[in-house]
Amino acid sequence: MASAGGEVVVVDPAAAAVAPDVEHHAPAPRLTPAGSGGRLMAELLGVFNGLTERMGDDVATSSSWTLLFRALKLALPALRDAAGGRSLARALIVAASLADLQMDAEVISAGIVRQAMDAGAVAMADAEAQLGPGAAALLLESLDVKNAPSRVDVADEEAASAVRNRILSGYDVRAVILELAIRLDAMKHLDGVPKHQQRTTSLEVLKVFAPLAHAVGAGALSKELEDLSFWRLYPQAYAQVDQWLSGQEDDCKRVLATCKDDLLQALAADDELRHTVAGFDVKGRYKSRFSAMKKLVKDGRRPEDVHDILGMRVILDHRAGAGDGHRACIRTHEVIKGMWKDVPARTKDYIARPKGDGYRSLHIAVDMSEPGPEGKKRPLMEVQIRTKEMNDAAVFGHALYKGCLADPEEAKRLKDIMLAAAEVAAQHLRDEPATGDQTGVPAAAAAAASAGNIERAFRLLDKNGDGRISMEELTELMEDLGAGGKDAEELMRLLDDNNDGSLSSDEFALFQKRVELKAKLEDKDDEYKEILRQKLQKVDDTGLIHVYRKNLSDKLVSG
C-alpha cells in the first residue's frame, strides 16, 4: 500500500509468470548484508557451510575445504559491491549448482572465482596464486569453452556439431560442466541485454551447450537450457506448447508423486525382488516444453500421439550373483501391471534385444486415466525399468545420442574420453577425510561427522594450530574480507565470552550455531511465504481477495 497526494493506492501484485517453469534446485547459500565484522564472518561461514554440506563424501576432504575457503575469501570482497551484490549472489548460485552436480572443490572454487573474473574484479594471476595451477587451468579452459561458439556460425548444424566435438575431445570435462553451469545462470539473467544478444546467446545454448549437457550426462541441466533458449528464441511457439502442457501439469505431477510412493512400497514388499534386488530408485518427470515441441514439430506427431508426457524410471540395485538382472526387470513389470492398466502394444524389451549402440532397458506404458466415461483423462505414462549397471551404461550412451554425435566410432571415442575425465575428476584432490579422529571407533566418527562444519571451519581460521583463534588471525580474516581492525575487535568482543582475547573452539561453535539457526529460520520463512502465496493465489482466483482489497481501500479512504 502506498499514499500519493493523499489518495490511498492498494497495490495488486501481478501474478503472471513469463519465464519457463524450469526445474528448481535447492537455493544457494545465503548472503548476509555487508557491514560489521560479525556479519562478514557470518556470511563467509554460512556460504562455506552450505557448499561443503552439498559436496559428496568422496570429494569433501581437508584439501577441498582449504581450497574452497581460499576461493571464498578471494571472491566475496571482490564481488560484494559489484552490481549491488548481484554478481556475488550469482556466483554462489553457480557454486551451489556445481556442488549439487557433485563436482570437486577445484570446479566449485573455479565457479566462484569465474564470476569475479568476468566482472573484472579478480585477475587470473591472483586466482592462480590463491587457488593453485589446477583451478587456474580449469578457469582458462572454461573461458576457451565459453568463446568456442563465437568463432563459427552455430546456426549451421555442421559447424555447431564440429564445435561440440572439439569441446568434448579437447577439454577437461569438468571445465565443460563449469561453463554449462555459468551458461544456465546467464540464461536466467538476459532481460537487461539487447535483444540481438539474447538471441545470439540463446542460439549458442540451443545448438552447442544444451547438447553438450546431454553428452556429459547432465540431463536436468540440459533440459533447463533447452527450455530457456526455446522460450527466448521462439516465444509464440513456446506459448502454444506451454498452454497445452500447463493445462494438465499440476494434476500429472501430483499423479507422478503418488505413483512413485506407491511403486516404491509395492516393490519393497515383493518377495521375489527382496531376494534379488538390494534397493530401488524411482524417478518421475514431466515432459519439457522443448522436448514436446520437437515431438510435435520435428517428428510431426499429433498431441494425442505423444506418449511420454509422463515418464518414470525405475533403477534396480541388483544383487551380485542373482542373474543378469533381466528377470528382476520382468518381475518389476509384473508388479506394475498389478497396480495400473498396462498397454501391451507399447512394451519394448531392449534387454532381450539391445539396441545397436548396446542400450538395454525394459520400456512399458501404463494408462493413468481414471476409469469410467466421466473419469479424468490423462496421457500415458512411459516407464523405463533397468538395473543400475544398465543405467550407468545408458547415461553416456544415450547422452551421446542426445548430444547429436551421430558417428558411432566418434561417439565411442568421445565416450571413452568422458569416462576417463570423470575418473580423473573423482581422484582429484582426494585424500584421507579429515575427521579429527583416526581411531576407527564408530561413535567417535559419528560425533566428528556431526560437528564437521564447526571443526573444519575452526581449523582453517586457526592458522598456527594452537587451538585458539587469536586477534591477529581474526584481523587477517577481516582484512581478507575487505573489513578492518575495528571490525575484528568488534567481533572479538561479541564472541569472546571469557574475555581472554582469543576464541576457543567452544566460543566459535556457539557463533556457528547462531549462524545455522539464522539460515534455518530464513529458509523456513521462505517456505511459509511460498505456501501462503499459493494458497492466497487460489483464493485470489475466486475474487475474494479483490473484494477484501476494495473494502479495505474504502475504509482507508473514508478514514
From Swiss-Prot:
Ca(2+) 1 binds at D462, N464, D466, R468, E473. Ca(2+) 2 binds at D496, N498, D500, S502, E507. It is found in: Plastid, Chloroplast. Residues 1-37 form a transit peptide. CDD domains: EFh, NT_Rel-Spo_like. Its EC number is 2.7.6.5. Activated by calcium. Residues 87-187 form the HD domain. InterPro entries: EF-hand-dom_pair, EF_Hand_1_Ca_BS, EF_hand_dom, HD_domain, NT_sf, RelA_SpoT. GO terms for biological process: guanosine tetraphosphate metabolic process. Its main location: plastid. It comes from the Eukaryota. It catalyses: GTP + ATP = guanosine 3'-diphosphate 5'-triphosphate + AMP. Residues 449-484, 486-518 form the EF-hand domain. GO terms for cellular component: chloroplast. Belongs to the RelA/SpoT family. The calcium-binding sites of the 2 EF-hand domains are required for enzyme activity. This is GTP diphosphokinase CRSH2, chloroplastic. It comes from Oryza sativa subsp. japonica (Rice).
